[in-house]
UniProtKB/Swiss-Prot annotation:
Keywords: Aminoacyl-tRNA synthetase, ATP-binding, Cytoplasm, Ligase, Nucleotide-binding, Protein biosynthesis
Positions contributing to ATP binding: 221-223, 486, 538-541
Protein task: Aspartyl-tRNA synthetase with relaxed tRNA specificity since it is able to aspartylate not only its cognate tRNA(Asp) but also tRNA(Asn). Reaction proceeds in two steps: L-aspartate is first activated by ATP to form Asp-AMP and then transferred to the acceptor end of tRNA(Asp/Asn).
Cited HAMAP family: Asp_tRNA_synth_type1
Gene: aspS
Principal location: cytoplasm
CDD domains linked: AspRS_core, EcAspRS_like_N
Primary enzyme class: ligase
Protein name listed in UniProt: Aspartate--tRNA(Asp/Asn) ligase
Enzyme nomenclature, EC number: 6.1.1.23
Length: 591
């Protein structure tokens, strides 16, 4: 017999009754029922009930055990009384009568009990993550993640992709976030960077003549944390293909993502018709470039009904260039109480409130509009708004106005809140959409033009498109949205040096700077670069959706906290003076 176990704690069934066996695992819990001990012994595979009475040689030692002590048990498998069978456990038909026990690893008093589903502060959970990972729900999430990664890897090989690994230490490049810099000991004053993505390397793989690449890639970005984003590092399914257009990439990745959600989605419906929604349309209708299409609400522009109207706030606002008024339909939200709740939501978003109209049955049996805006507009205009929005008795509409960039994001969040409050969102499905035709550039608060998405994307229209208004240029860039999250992002790449130089010039990068920062890729493009494109799918976020979690740290084995700290390992930590001397660095005091 093995020194530690003949079976796992999830393996024994009624067929093993009468067998002499050996188990090892953690003491999940101990119950003393009047001289008979019941011990739930747990390992990675499951739980087996161990019993010992006062006649057992192991009784005295078992009686002193603390929870989470690691023990080895020798014993005999017995069938449970039929009334005591536990159908929730694979081992629920049997129990093991202990004849001998050895402590393999003692446990101190626990700062975080493993048994039960009590919630604990995140700081405690992350400090004692090794204990937290023993808890069933988190343990299952991490195992789900492992199965997802294996499934993705197999699916990519089946599609003819080849797996390659790209460097982890590389040069800094502008890819939308701050780099993590690594000082060079051999080259004082110079720094490497951890890659935000394998972007340049995967393009160089295509230039090198390989046709279809993928890897499960670690990415490093010094970002502000969110519930759906890690502040330091994450993993993505990264892929690139030669001689492809945008639709070719879509055809390659859809069966992978769709199949993954069908396999691990827990029976939730998986949408198979993935619409292509231009970025401008997504922002107009949904107030987001990652819309939750489970919510049927679509916003509409209703400026014409307010222009020159008796509702002075919007009428005056619409006299300014570039302004509009948008309506958010709220089917079933036609009550003042609901309007008050939504106004409270808007105030929580930093707005003074949202205008609203709701429709109700009048005394004469017709449908009439109510609310402050309705009084100011009059029945003719409110009826026109109702008709445009397709609303009726018992419904409402909420209104926001101004320059779209000042209110679109809040309008999108309000749309989501209205959908949730009114029960319009079907939680039992995954709905996907490709967001396409992203603007290549955006204007910052300082008035400067910069890339809005991926700087290595091919502009639609090629070089000619870059000779006009930069803000009118669209790129061959695309995101895949699912249930309000961005799951995939990608682009057809700019593989022509002359177009690349011009594209970067518009964003304020001179030719010399482009050569300095991206010299390897620019040089490669001068020696015959194929048209190529690809995308990357965020594995952490995908697993978060599949596990039905709302916090990405619930699907990462050892995550950072919201302040980008590893409470378990004590990172970040201060370097020693010797390390600083070797690297010729000095730490300046915080100003």
């Amino acid at each position: 017999m093995s020194a530690y176990r003949s079976h796992t704690c999830g393996e024994l069934t009624a067929a093993a009754a009468g067998s002499e066996i050996r188990l090892s695992g953690w003491v999940h819990r101990v119950r003393d029922h009047g001289g008979v001990l019941f011990i739930d012994l747990r390992d990675h595979y499951g739980i087996t009930q161990v019993i010992a009475d006062s006649d057992s040689l192991a009784f005295a030692a078992l009686e002193k055990l603390r929870a989470e002590t690691v023990i080895r048990i020798d014993g005999r498998v017995k069938l449970r009384d039929p009334s005591l069978v536990n159908p929730k456990l694979p081992t629920g038909e049997i129990e093991v009568y202990a004849t001998a026990m050895e402590v393999l690893g003692a446990a101190d008093d626990l700062p975080l009990p493993v048994f039960g589903d009590q919630d604990y502060p995140e700081e405690t959970r992350l400090t004692y993550r090794f204990l937290d990972l023993r808890r069933e729900s988190l343990h299952n999430n991490i195992m789900l993640r492992s199965r997802v990664v294996k499934w993705l890897r197999d699916a990519m090989w089946d599609q003819g992709f080849t797996e390659f690994q790209t460097p982890i230490i590389t040069a800094s490049s502008p890819e939308g976030a701050r780099d993590f810099l690594v000082p060079s000991r051999l080259h004082p004053g110079k720094f490497y960077a951890l890659p935000q993505a394998p972007q340049q390397f995967k393009q160089l793989i295509m230039v090198a003549g390989f046709d279809k690449y993928f890897q499960i890639a670690p990415c490093f970005r010094d970002e502000d944390p969110r519930a759906d984003r890690s502040p330091t590092d994450f993993y993505q399914l990264d892929l690139e293909m030669s001689f492809v257009e945008q639709e070719d990439v879509f055809r390659a990745i859809q069966p992978v993502i769709q199949g993954l959600f069908e396999e691990f989605g827990g029976g939730r419906r998986v949408d198979t018709d993935w619409p292509r929604i231009p970025y401008a349309e997504a922002m107009l209708k949904y107030g987001s470039d990652k819309p939750d299409l489970r919510n049927p609400i679509e916003m509409q522009v209703v400026s014409d009904h307010f222009r020159g109207s008796g509702f002075a706030i919007f009428a005056k606002l619409l006299e300014q260039d570039g302004t509009e008024v948008r309506a958010i339909p709220a089917p079933g939200g036609g009550s003042r109480k609901f309007a008050d709740r939504m106004n409270a939501f808007a105030q929580g978003q930093g707005l003074p409130g949202m205008g609203y109209i709701f429709w109700r049955k009048a005394e004469d049996g017709t449908t009439e509009a109510a609310g402050p805006i309705a009084k100011a507009l009059g029945p003719e205009k409110t009826e026109a708004i109702r008709t445009q929005l397709g609303l009726g008795e018992g419904d409402a509409a909420f209104f926001l106005g101004g320059k779209p960039e000042t209110f679109e994001a809040v309008a999108g969040r309000a749309r989501n809140e209205i959908g949730r409050e009114l029960g319009l969102i079907d939680e039992n499905q995954f709905k996907f959409a490709w967001i396409v035709d992203f603007p290549m550039y955006e204007k910052g608060e300082d008035g400067r033009i910069d890339f809005s998405h991926n700087p290595f994307s091919m502009p639609q229209g090629g070089l000619d498109a870059l000779e006009g208004d930069p803000l009118a240029v669209m790129g061959y860039q695309y995101d895949l949205a699912c249930n309000g999250y961005e799951l995939v992002s990608g682009a057809i790449r700019n593989h022509r040096p002359e177009i690349m130089f011009r594209a970067f010039e518009l964003a304020g990068y001179g030719r010399d700077e482009v050569e300095k920062r991206f010299g390897g890729m620019v040089k490669a493009f001068r020696y015959g670069a194929p048209p190529h494109g690809g995308c990357a799918a965020g594995i952490d976020r995908i697993v978060m959706l599949l596990a039905d979690e709302v916090n990405i740290r619930e699907v990462i084995m050892f995550p950072m906290n919201q302040r980008a700290e590893d409470l378990m390992m004590g990172a970040p930590s201060e370097p020693t003076n010797e390390q600083l001397r070797e690297l010729r660095l000095r730490v300046l005091p915080r100003e």
